[in-house]
Amino acid sequence: MIVRIYPSEISGTIKAPQSKSLAIRLIFLSLFTRIHLHNLVLSEDVIDAINSVRALGVEVKNNSEFIPPEKLEIKKKFIKLKGSGTTLRMLIPIVAAIGGEVTIDAEESLRRRPLKRIVEALSNYGISFSSSSLPLTITGKLSSYNIKISGDESSQYISGLIYALHILNGGSIEILPPISSKSYILLTVDLFNRFGSNVKFYGNKIHINPNNLVEFQGEVAGDYGLASFYALSALVSGGRTTIVNLWEPKEYFGDHSIVKILKEMGATSEYLDGKWYVEAKDKYSSIKVNIDDAPDLAMTIAGLAAIAEGTSEITGIERLRIKESDRIESIRKVLGLYGVGSEVKSNSILIFGINKRMLSSPITDCLNDHRVAMMSSALALVNGGVITSAECVSKSNPNYWQDLLSLNAKISIE
C-alpha cells in the first residue's frame, strides 16, 4: 500500500484507537473469567492474543466473546504468532504455569527479539527451553511459586508471570533492578485488582493472592500512545483535535504522560472528562525527557521535537532497538528524510529542531513498523510526502488512514 499525503490542516473529533496493551491483557484474563469485548478492533497483535488463548482451551465466539475452559491445558502443540511482542512475552510464563510441551514461532520481526531473561529465569524453576529465541520449544511445569527475574529486558515477562501465578493460585515475583517500562506492570496489577484479585506491588516485589475474578462486558478503552499520533498531526499541521474514549491519566509515568509532555513543549494539551483537547501553537519548545517507562512515546515526542525551537533530548531509549524495527535508527532515518538533524548517543537521541516550513517532502518506507508510518505521516502534513508499505499500521490501528481522512487530512491511498 502506498499513501500519498498532501499539505493539510487537521481538525475535528476522533475516537482514540483501542489500547492493544489493554485488549491483550483482557483477552488473557479469559483464562480465568468470561470476557465479552464490544466492537473489538482486530489488529494483528489482538489476533495473536486471540489465537493464543484459543490454543489454551478458551472458547472464542465471533472474535469478541471469550469463555474460559473448565481446565487449563495446552490444546495445540504449535502456536504461530505474527508479530506481537506483548503476546509472546506474556504467553511464555503462562504456558510454563499450565505445564506440558509447546512450540512457539512467529514472523521474522519477532524472531529477532531477545528472550534471554525469561529463559534464564524459568530455567531455574523446572522449565526446559530449546533456545533463547524463536522458534522456541517449552517443556515442563513451573516448580516454584516464588520467581526471580531480571527487569531490564521487558516488563511483559513480569505481566505474564502475574497471570502464571494466578494459574498456580498465588506466589511472588522478585524483580532484579533495573525495572523497565514499570507503567505496564502497574497496568496489569491495576487490571487484576479491578477484577477482584489481590495483587500488591511494593518496591521490586509483587505478591499475588488470587480471588475469583468478575466477568467483564464492555469496550476496550483508548490508547494514549496510538492516539498521540492524532495529537501530533494536529500540532504539526497547525490544527486542532479532540480525542475521545480515553481513561483519566494515572499519577505514575506512562503513555498517558504524553498529555503533559506536549503541554510542556508549548502545545495546548488538556484532558477533561474522557476527552483530550489538543490545539497547535505558532512555536514549540525543546524538551529533555526520559521515556524508559513509556518507550512507545518516543516517536511522537521526536515528531514534535523536529519542529521545536532548540535541541531536544530523549533519554532512556536503549530498548527501542528491540521493537518492530530498531526505533532509534528509524527515528534518525525518518527525521533525516525530512531534513531534521539528530545525534544518537549511548542511551539518548538529540534532535535539532527546524522551522517546519523547511521540512522536506520525502518518500518513507515504514520498515514494517507501524509507528514509523504514523510519525512520518504527521510530518508529511506540512509539505507533503509518500509512505510506502503503509499497511504496516494494521499491526496496531487498522483504521489509521481512514481516521486521518476523517480529520480532514488530504491523502490518497493506492
Curated annotation (Swiss-Prot):
Keyword Repeat carried by entry: no
GO biological process, one term: chorismate biosynthetic process
Subcellular location: Cytoplasm
Catalyzed reactions per annotation: 3-phosphoshikimate + phosphoenolpyruvate = 5-O-(1-carboxyvinyl)-3-phosphoshikimate + phosphate
Claim: Transferase is one of the keywords in the record: yes
Active site: D296
Binding annotation for phosphoenolpyruvate: K20, G85, R113, Q156, R327, R371, K395
SUPFAM superfamilies: EPT/RTPC-like (SSF55205)
Pathway: Metabolic intermediate biosynthesis; chorismate biosynthesis
One Gene Ontology CC term in the entry: cytoplasm
InterPro entries noted in UniProt: Enolpyruvate_Tfrase_dom (IPR001986), Enolpyruvate_Tfrase_sf (IPR036968), EPSP_synthase (IPR006264), EPSP_synthase_CS (IPR023193), RNA3'P_cycl/enolpyr_Trfase_a/b (IPR013792)
Binding site for 3-phosphoshikimate: K20, S21, R25, S154, S155, Q156, S181, D296, K323
PROSITE patterns: EPSP_SYNTHASE_1, EPSP_SYNTHASE_2
Location, primary (coarse class): cytoplasm
EC number: 2.5.1.19
Keyword field: Amino-acid biosynthesis, Aromatic amino acid biosynthesis, Cytoplasm, Transferase
Record GO terms (molecular function): 3-phosphoshikimate 1-carboxyvinyltransferase activity
Pfam families the record matches: EPSP_synthase (PF00275)
PANTHER family: AROM/DEHYDROQUINATE SYNTHASE, PENTAFUNCTIONAL AROM POLYPEPTIDE
Similarity comment: family membership: Belongs to the EPSP synthase family.
Subunit structure and binding partners: Monomer.
Chain's role: Catalyzes the transfer of the enolpyruvyl moiety of phosphoenolpyruvate (PEP) to the 5-hydroxyl of shikimate-3-phosphate (S3P) to produce enolpyruvyl shikimate-3-phosphate and inorganic phosphate.
Protein name: 3-phosphoshikimate 1-carboxyvinyltransferase
Organism: Saccharolobus islandicus (strain L.S.2.15 / Lassen #1)
Gene name in the database record: aroA
